Amino acid sequence: MRADKSLSPFEIRVYRHYRIVHGTRVALAFLLTFLIIRLFTIPESTWPLVTMVVIMGPISFWGNVVPRAFERIGGTVLGSILGLIALQLELISLPLMLVWCAAAMFLCGWLALGKKPYQGLLIGVTLAIVVGSPTGEIDTALWRSGDVILGSLLAMLFTGIWPQRAFIHWRIQLAKSLTEYNRVYQSAFSPNLLERPRLESHLQKLLTDAVKMRGLIAPASKETRIPKSIYEGIQTINRNLVCMLELQINAYWATRPSHFVLLNAQKLRDTQHMMQQILLSFVHALYEGNPQPVFANTEKLNNAVEELRQLLNNHHDLKVVETPIYGYVWLNMETAHQLELLSNLICRALRK
């Protein structure tokens, strides 16, 4: 997919309510599968429905559909074979059949905690369905095996119809995170406040949302073929910005005298306003897929870093700077540097 594709208002609305969309997809898939079973009078008709729900339940982004499809179908076929062998062993020796099933379930558990959890899950589910057939009724076992494979194929078909794209979801979540960060930033350093605002819950939510985005990195990288290191870099900077914002708030409201000094510093106010505008440009770039406005921020951020560094040097020479003032100015300088890095990474993520 094109990384610089502009997001329409409809797409943004759909991805913001992806749980409703996914629930609707599963419901329609269940109804269509049920109608197919009734239309063709398929024996052991419970198992295609069970398999379809088990496979479609966890939401699959497009970057995971193909590899998970092979994992699930492979697990289903292997589970069917293991189950049929177990039924044959039961005719020879029940203890031998139990040992075989135990070994198969060990494989299921081992794979479930590895890199192929879906394959392990389907091996166990299919094995349980097949060996649940009455003793010696191979026809029933074969029908159940075929039903599980049918349910897997139908689930893959429905999952592949208008799938959720992790990269689009990642862009929307990052834009939302930066928007919320900008709001907290404005609230914390507003010149109209007389007391420190209570923003602890908002900061915690920002950090929690940043951590949740990590699950989108792998499928988004597969969809766009953008190196995971770029997503990881953006993830790290996003988390760093939230942590530094909390430290900035502490320094800004540390003491009343230092607060008034920072409040009346024109360069700092200009820097704050510039950072707010830059954050908005990031949000627009993520929604519109156009990194050009972000390129223009690099020079502004470089100038801001130099001005803040000069401000620190001037106060350092006078030896009258208080610790909160020095810390706040230094954190502003580091924030500007982090935004510069974020600007470069967003441009690379939205490349054509």
Protein language model annotation of sequence segments:
Residues M1-G23, H169-I234, L247-K352:
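Long, hydrophobic alpha-helical segments that serve as membrane-spanning/inserting helices
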Residues N240-L247:
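A membrane-cytosol interface segment of integral membrane proteins
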Residues M1-A210, I217-A218, K222, L341-R351:
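A transmembrane helix-and-boundary motif of multi-pass membrane transporters/channels
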